């Protein structure tokens, strides 16, 4: 990924977040990166910032705690909101700032997925941009705190904005944030039954 640093186009290599389902049936949030034909999961993100020179390319040795990512499947999104019970909100390290379209510090429609200590899957969506009066949406910090209040020990921000929508038995639960309140066509959806 490229960003402008001191007037020059600069390559960065951020670790990115994934909500993983492992073979033993457990869910976890991880930061991952594919290096040398192997995908590694990390306990911590590479501590990048678009205001500093880029860090090394993630590998087996960097950042610390690398292990082979052995999940059965995963949902890539970001940033991580909660990891191991701690609010992380790693949008700076994942370079998911205003330039990325995430708008982490402004109220926006948001979607998130999380897991509680006892294995309950939490799916969350909120509308925003005043589609309903006095409902501005949430910042990523507010979303992280809410997912923590729901009991999540791991949680991940999913695509928000006009992509935030939840249907239950075919019925919308919020007003999507376009003029017609219609669902935006998206390439990937999450189904639960």
Regions found by a protein language model. Name each.
Residues 1-193:
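Gly/Ser/Thr/Pro-rich low-complexity, intrinsically disordered segments
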């Amino acid at each position: 990924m490229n960003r402008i640093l001191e007037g020059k186009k600069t390559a960065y290599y951020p670790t990115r977040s994934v909500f993983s389902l492992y073979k033993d049936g457990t869910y976890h949030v991880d930061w991952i990166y594919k290096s040398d034909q192997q995908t590694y999961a990390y306990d911590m993100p590479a501590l990048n910032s678009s205001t500093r020179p880029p860090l090394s390319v993630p590998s087996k040795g960097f950042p610390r705690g690398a292990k082979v990512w052995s999940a059965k499947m995963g949902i890539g999104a970001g940033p991580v909101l909660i990891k191991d019970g701690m609010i992380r909100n790693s949008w700076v390290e994942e370079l998911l700032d205003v330039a990325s379209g995430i708008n982490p510090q402004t109220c926006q429609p948001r979607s998130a997925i999380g897991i509680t200590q006892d294995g309950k899957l939490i799916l969350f969506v909120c509308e925003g941009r005043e589609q309903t009066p006095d409902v501005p949406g949430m910042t990523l910090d507010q979303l992280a705190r809410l997912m923590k209040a729901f009991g999540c020990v791991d949680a991940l921000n999913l695509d928000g904005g006009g992509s935030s929508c939840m249907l239950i038995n075919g019925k919308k639960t919020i007003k999507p944030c376009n003029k017609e309140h219609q669902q935006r066509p998206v390439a990937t959806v999450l189904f639960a039954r």
